[in-house]
Structures are given as structure tokens and as C-alpha cells.
């Protein structure tokens, strides 16, 4: 099976694959050049999803749910604190999600060490709407009702891929761990309640450069 160039989308300067992460194939130089001729800075091409040997770049996949008692003590503490502080919920309406999520997305983008220009609200909504079977999550601080963390997931028949995860900067260093709580709730929902076989939750390389939470790895 070969990729079609229509399977790629331009996202913040990078061409990224839109299909299931386990179906992406290696692009030829000609295909990569054809994409770059349409704009963008680089092509992200992740192939050999389940190769036999260890490489310097790998996807993080979770295939079972660990309830709180099964986790390390330090992780249990962060999740319990998060669940006491925030309400985590799946939002069925895209317009409602965008109203809650866009301020979180914008502030998170502006807070990156390598400055990134946030998309407009309209473009953010269009990007969310373009996701195949997209599902939307928000974590809201109970005391104030303020959105603290958001996620957009792309759901397939037997797997779920996390494609967006953003946390409002002011909630990242107040010891309430909104991201850990949201991840825990999503893992419970998809792996235990929905019964998907696996969640694909990002990539990591030997350079340790990743936005994946410590909780996910450990």
C-alpha cells in the first residue's frame, strides 16, 4: 500500500500524515519534494510503525488501562489531586469545544520556547472539524469554571490517536496537574469503557525532545 499525497496536511509549517499512524509508508524523495513545492518547511514521514529492531525514534502506544492503585505512588498523588481540582469531560459539540478550547490553545502556543504563531479561531475550528471521527475533551477547573487543558483525538475502529494536547500555562506550575488527570480519564474511557485496542499518544526520540508527559512514559 502506498500513501497518497492527499493523505498529508500542512500543520504549522510541517506536512503530516492524516491517516492511521500504523498505515503510513515511506515517501520517495520525489513525493516529499512535491509536498514541499506546495509550501511548508519540512515533511514528517513516520513509517515502519511496528518494525523488529529498536530505532532512534518511536511512537508511544498504550494498550491497557492502569487504574490508580496500579500506578507509582508519585503518579497516583498527581492524578488524585487533578481529579479533585478539575472536571474532565468529552464535548460532543464542536462549536462548544472551540469556545472552551481556543483560549487554551492560543495561550499554550504563545508560551512555547520556540515561538509559534497560533492559528486564528476560525482556522483552529476548521482544523478540528477536518479530523476523521474527531472527539474533543476539556478539563475545567471546578472552582472557577475556567478551561485548563484540552485534547483532540482521532478515533478509528480499534484505536485512538491523540493529535492535540494543550495546557494553559498558568495551570502547569501550580501543582494541580491538569494534564495527568485528563490523560488518566481518556485512557480509562477509551481503553476500558470503549474497548479500543490501543492509544497512540505521540512520539519520542533519543534526544528526549518530546511534549509527552512523564506520567505516560512511566
Task: Name each region found by the language model.
Residues 39-47, 191-204:
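Conserved GNAT acetyl-CoA-binding A-motif
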Residues 173-185:
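Conserved acetyl-CoA pyrophosphate-binding loop and the N-cap/start of the following alpha-helix
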Residues 1-10, 45-52, 61-175, 189-191:
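A conserved beta-strand-loop-helix scaffold within acyl/acetyltransferase catalytic domains
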Amino acid at each position: 500500500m502506498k500513501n497518497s499525497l492527499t493523505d498529508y496536511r500542512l500543520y504549522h509549517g510541517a506536512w503530516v500524515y492524516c491517516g492511521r499512524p500504523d498505515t503510513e509508508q515511506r515517501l520517495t524523495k520525489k513525493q516529499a519534494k512535491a509536498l514541499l513545492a506546495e509550501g511548508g518547511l519540512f515533511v514528517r514521514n513516520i513509517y515502519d510503525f511496528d518494525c523488529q529492531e529498536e530505532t532512534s525514534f518511536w511512537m508511544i502506544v498504550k494498550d491497557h488501562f492502569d487504574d490508580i492503585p496500579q500506578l507509582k505512588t508519585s503518579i497516583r498523588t498527581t492524578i488524585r489531586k487533578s481529579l479533585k481540582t478539575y472536571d474532565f469531560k468529552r464535548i460532543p459539540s464542536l462549536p462548544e469545544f472551540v469556545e472552551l478550547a481556543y483560549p487554551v490553545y492560543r495561550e499554550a502556543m504563545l508560551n512555547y520556547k520556540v515561538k509559534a504563531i497560533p492559528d486564528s479561531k476560525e482556522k483552529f475550528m476548521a482544523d478540528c472539524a477536518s479530523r476523521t471521527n474527531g472527539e474533543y475533551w476539556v478539563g475545567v477547573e471546578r472552582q472557577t469554571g475556567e478551561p485548563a487543558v484540552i485534547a483532540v483525538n482521532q478515533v478509528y475502529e480499534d484505536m485512538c490517536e491523540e493529535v492535540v494536547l494543550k495546557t494553559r500555562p498558568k495551570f502547569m506550575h501550580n501543582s494541580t496537574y491538569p494534564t495527568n488527570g485528563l490523560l488518566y480519564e481518556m485512557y480509562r474511557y477509551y481503553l476500558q469503557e470503549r474497548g479500543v485496542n490501543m492509544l497512540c499518544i505521540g512520539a519520542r526520540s533519543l534526544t528526549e525532545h518530546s511534549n509527552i508527559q512523564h506520567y505516560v512514559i512511566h
